[in-house]
Amino acid sequence: MNNQQKIKCPICDKQNTWRPDNLFRPFCSERCKLIDLGEWASESRKIPGSSIDPESIVTTNNKQDNVDEQ
């Protein structure tokens, strides 16, 4: 019995098998994976929601004190 799940590539809709050895899953190929990355980078893909006012973003100082150096 074959229990491997068939999925469609989110970019080209090509059917492929969800397998641990598919390094590009859920995409069918490196090409489709890079197309998706490019769409996120160019902001043609976004998570819907309200815009955030940059002035309201709280920043933190992540520097750690180096106690051992004296």
UniProtKB/Swiss-Prot annotation:
Gene3D superfamilies: Erythroid Transcription Factor GATA-1, subunit A
Disordered, as annotated region: 44-70
Cofactor binding comment, as recorded: Binds 1 zinc ion.
Gene Ontology BP annotations: regulation of DNA-templated transcription
InterPro entries: DNA_gyrase_inhibitor_YacG (IPR005584), Znf_NHR/GATA (IPR013088)
GO molecular function: DNA topoisomerase type II (double strand cut, ATP-hydrolyzing) inhibitor activity; zinc ion binding
Cofactor needs: Zn(2+)
Keywords on record: Metal-binding, Zinc
Domain of life: Bacteria
Annotated binding of Zn(2+), by residue: 9, 12, 28, 32
PANTHER family: DNA GYRASE INHIBITOR YACG (PTHR36150:SF1)
Summary of subunit composition and partner proteins: Interacts with GyrB.
Function: Inhibits all the catalytic activities of DNA gyrase by preventing its interaction with DNA. Acts by binding directly to the C-terminal domain of GyrB, which probably disrupts DNA binding by the gyrase.
Annotated protein name in UniProt: DNA gyrase inhibitor YacG
Native source organism of the sequence: Legionella pneumophila subsp. pneumophila (strain Philadelphia 1 / ATCC 33152 / DSM 7513)
